[in-house]
């Protein structure tokens, strides 16, 4: 029997944000609400902060609540107030500042994703700050974004009164602030956001929602050898891995990622990590305990470099464009000519590679793109190898000294046999070399002459000197 696994997420509310009266906003109670003649049950379900809506349907939905016919009542009405194309005149009546900032947030514009995809696929370097999922063209990179990637931005319209944690995309304000669609009551608009609202978008790409809850995507062939019953509703096979200690303790996503992160209050960030305001030190006093793990030689390490238990990694991706096929265009909201076929393989969910970020600190990196691409505009297929920084959200006890100081994977060289002798690093890769001279799971080679690509200036793999320092460090 095949069990479909929607989520392995415990929805625990640690923080319930109180609803506050919005300064300068006054809701007028309007008598004679004819909406309830057909929708009497929808007066129930409101939380206190939105209880005015029980007799003021048109405040959010529009329409005419004095009309007596269905046609007249529904004229100019919207069934989903809170979609970003109507949020200014619905949610914006009370939350104008939030609607404005959300519309400029990365969850709507995807600035960093658009910029990196264009750079890698088309080789173009445009104005990162102006990149936007709502203004895509039709070149290879933008076509890929239209057909495969832009389904997760908040501007996507919601068109069904139901929740699907795995497949849900978009919906503007509703994407986060509605947790249930009861049949006999009005959905409760709430600042209590469940992890299920994050899962639909954040279980792909970096797979943060999966990792946090202790699930990891695997190859179907691998699943056949393990527990094939573990499968998401969209068909992806997963395995159980150690969950993040914060998840195990009952912390939800919004316990750390609050409005300042999610609704662009932090500013006009281009990349996701620049929009995140929360830090480990907000809760954990960073003390330099008297032991080897915290001595000065580790001062450049980010907390997650040692405390991440594993990192989701994928080393085999193939993308092929078929101009004769048809596929849903998430910008046009219709099926259009051209289809991208995507194949993924070679998953690994183990400790990952270390690299240097733009602040000269050492953090974890994972394959952002190790793939081949085919498009009729190109004479030959393209091969792309790019590693990106990642916060895996698999926090736990610190990894062992050996897992860094005696590991070729940690150095970014990929799996294989490594040793330091005769003042030289000797490495024999476990996997065959690809066309660019590196094995599939490597980011760079020992002298840094191959690979090494990262999304942003200043990000890089460890250099030879840093590798030697890691390998020659005495172990306890």
Regions found by a protein language model. Give the residues of each.
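C-type cytochrome heme-c attachment and multiheme electron-transfer modules
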Residues: 14, 19-44, 53-174, 192-476
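A generic local secondary-structure boundary/capping motif
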Residues: 187-190
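Positively charged n-region of N-terminal signal peptides that target proteins for export
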Residues: 1-5
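Bacterial N-terminal signal peptides
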Residues: 6-16
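Thiamine diphosphate
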Residues: 175, 184-185
């Amino acid at each position: 029997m095949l069990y479909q696994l929607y989520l392995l997420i415990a929805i625990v509310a640690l923080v319930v944000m109180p609803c506050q009266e919005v300064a300068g906003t006054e809701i007028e109670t309007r008598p004679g609400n004819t909406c309830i003649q057909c929708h009497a049950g929808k007066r129930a379900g409101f939380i206190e902060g939105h209880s005015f809506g029980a007799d003021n349907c048109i405040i959010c939905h529009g329409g005419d609540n004095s009309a007596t016919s269905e046609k007249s009542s529904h004229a100019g009405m919207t069934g989903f107030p809170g979609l970003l194309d109507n949020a200014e005149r619905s949610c914006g009546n009370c939350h104008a500042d939030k609607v404005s900032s959300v519309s400029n947030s990365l969850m709507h514009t995807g600035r960093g994703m658009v910029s990196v995809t264009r750079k890698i696929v088309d080789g173009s370097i445009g104005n990162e700050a102006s990149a936007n999922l709502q203004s895509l063209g039709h070149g290879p990179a933008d076509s890929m974004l239209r057909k495969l990637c832009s389904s997760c931005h908040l501007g996507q319209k919601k068109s069904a009164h139901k929740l699907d944690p795995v497949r849900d995309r978009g919906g503007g304000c509703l994407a986060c602030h509605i947790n249930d669609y009861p049949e006999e009551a009005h959905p409760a608009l709430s600042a209590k956001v469940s992890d299920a609202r994050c899962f639909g978008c954040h279980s792909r790409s970096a797979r943060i929602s999966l990792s946090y809850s202790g699930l990891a995507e695997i190859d179907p062939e691998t699943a056949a050898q393990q527990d094939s019953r573990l499968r998401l509703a969209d068909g992806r096979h997963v395995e159980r891995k150690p969950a993040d200690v914060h998840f195990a303790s009952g912390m939800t996503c919004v316990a750390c990622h609050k409005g300042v992160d999610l609704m662009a209050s932090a500013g006009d960030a281009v990349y996701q990590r620049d929009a995140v305001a929360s830090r480990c030190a907000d809760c954990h006093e960073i003390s330099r305990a008297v032991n080897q793990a915290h001595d000065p030689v580790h001062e450049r390490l980010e907390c997650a470099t040692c405390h991440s238990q594993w990192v989701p990694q994928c080393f085999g991706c193939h993308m092929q464009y078929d101009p004769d096929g048809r596929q849903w265009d998430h910008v046009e909201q219709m099926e259009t000519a051209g289809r991208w076929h995507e194949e993924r393989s070679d998953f690994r969910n183990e400790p990952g590679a270390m690299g240097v970020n733009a602040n000269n600190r050492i953090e974890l990196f994972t394959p952002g793109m190790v793939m081949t691409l085919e498009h009729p505009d190109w004479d030959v297929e393209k091969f792309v190898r790019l590693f990106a920084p990642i916060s895996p959200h698999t926090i736990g006890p610190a990894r062992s000294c050996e897992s860094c100081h005696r590991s070729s994977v940690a150095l970014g060289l990929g799996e294989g046999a490594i040793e330091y002798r005769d003042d030289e690093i000797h490495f024999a890769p476990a996997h065959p070399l690809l066309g660019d001279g590196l094995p599939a799971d490597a980011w760079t080679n020992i002298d840094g002459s191959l690979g090494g690509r990262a999304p942003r200036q200043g990000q890089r793999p460890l250099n030879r000197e840093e590798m030697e320092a890691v390998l020659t460090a005495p172990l306890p």
